[in-house]
Amino acid sequence: MEFLGTTQTATYCGPKKPCGGSVLPSVASGPTVQECYQPYYLPGYRYLNAWRPSLFYKVANAQTCLDEGATCRSALRPPTILPAVRSALFCRYSPQDWDQSNRLQLCGAEASRLWAGRMTGDSMRLMQDKDQLTRQMQEGTCRNLGQRLSDIGFWKSELNYELERLLNENHSLDAIKRRLECAAEELRCPLQVALECLYQREKRIGIDLVHDNVEKNLIREVDMIKCCQEQMRKLAQRIDIQMRENRDAQHALERDLEDKNSAEFIDEKCLNLRNTSDCISFFHGVEKIDGTISVPETWAKFSNDNIRHSQNMRANSIRLREEAQNLFDVLADQLWRQFTNTNLAFNARIAEETDVKNKLQTQLAKTLQEIFQTENTIMLLERSIMAKECPLKVAQTRLECRTRRPNVELCRDSPQFKLVNEVFTIDDTLQTLKLRLRETRDTLQLLVMTKCRLEHELAIKANTLCIDKEKCMAMRKTFPSTPCMGICP
């Protein structure tokens, strides 16, 4: 049997060769290195495979015995007649060969180790340099994205501000138009607004559906508006044309805002991406695609032009409203008192509703805090119960194990008393905690019911406040009964 790592030239594997020139076996050629690696490219890393080894190594087995040596061994076998007459037929290496071989092995190992150490150090420095470069590039990109988000936020705020002012102007202009048309049709629009307030207030819920001072003043105002007549048709036509132009400017602002919202969402998503994000992937050749259609200068100019156009439209609208306001002065004296009285009643009612709503919200906040504390108490009680179960299991297991003691060893000793007492004590503790847990849960249920009632009352008050403040008062801001009704603040 041939052992792994042995050669056929060892002294115990064959007789001595007849040649006397050399006592050493022929030296086999060194390990042959074959380049057999075909690189495998990951997606996006066709030219970034420096982290993989460039070679696989295959070591060829050395031929350690020549054909002639085999012939010599087969020809010269030692005689088996008398062991005493055997000659020294086995060749051996010299101590110098042995020392030289060891030195060569040690030197080779040391050289390989030093080379590997240098390669490791260089690799670590290379990785650190590339990591620092990658981190700096990523931080720079994040800063640029943050600056871009700041620019988008600035223009969004400008567009929102202008859009809000344009919308307010459109509402005001629409109110002027309605007032002019209604003046031409015997002030039917003021009558409709007053009736709409009454209609909206009919949508109040529950106890808030009261016949209050606001409703009385609205009914009185409806009766007074029916007496007013005026015609302003020509100015209404000009206002209608201006409103169409305002809507065009509004749509341009809204489209610009929508695009900026989308861009802000995308850039914010890009800014929040990290190396550990789940949604990152390879996109081959994306850096070669340039689908941009603007530069920062033209991008800013586009929004600035939209804002300037909207400002021009608002200026035209303001001039038209001022012209209409001069016509409304004739009607102002007749409806001023009733309009003021109704508004004062609305403000007083809104103040009352706001005060009640704030009190309910305060009580709801306290109730929610108490619910939170009660839930925490329930959680702590449940944890405490769970924490007591393991000691109870331990004590019961100990008792059960001690019941298996043999014969007279089954003694009612001090540990037995202690274990029994421990089981009773822990069980009593568990029962007490479970009772307290049930009581706490009942309290939590009561608090939840209270919260539901408060939320229902808050919904009623919020609905009433929305009707009076957001709907009725918003409509009455464009109500044509005072000199200032043509211009919205």
From Swiss-Prot:
GO terms for cellular component: axonemal A tubule inner sheath; microtubule cytoskeleton; sperm flagellum. InterPro entries: Tektin-like (IPR048256), Tektins (IPR000435). This is Tektin-5. Residues 158-188, 225-264, 346-383, 427-447 form a coiled coil. Pfam families: Tektin (PF03148). It is found in: Cytoplasm, Cytoskeleton, Flagellum axoneme. PANTHER family: TEKTIN (PTHR19960), TEKTIN-5 (PTHR19960:SF23). The gene is TEKT5. Keywords: Cell projection, Cilium, Coiled coil, Cytoplasm, Cytoskeleton, Flagellum, Ubl conjugation. Belongs to the tektin family. One of its GO terms (biological process) is flagellated sperm motility. The keyword Cytoplasm applies. Microtubule inner protein component of sperm flagellar doublet microtubules. Interacts with TEKT3. The keyword Cytoplasm applies. Ubiquitinated, leading to its degradation. Deubiquitinated by USP16, promoting its stability. Sperm-specific microtubule inner protein (MIP) part of the dynein-decorated doublet microtubules (DMTs) in flagellar axoneme. Forms an extensive interaction network in different conformations that reinforces the helix bundle composed by other tektin proteins (TEKT1 to TEKT4) and MIPs to anchor the tektin bundle onto the tubulin wall of A-tubule of the sperm flagellum.
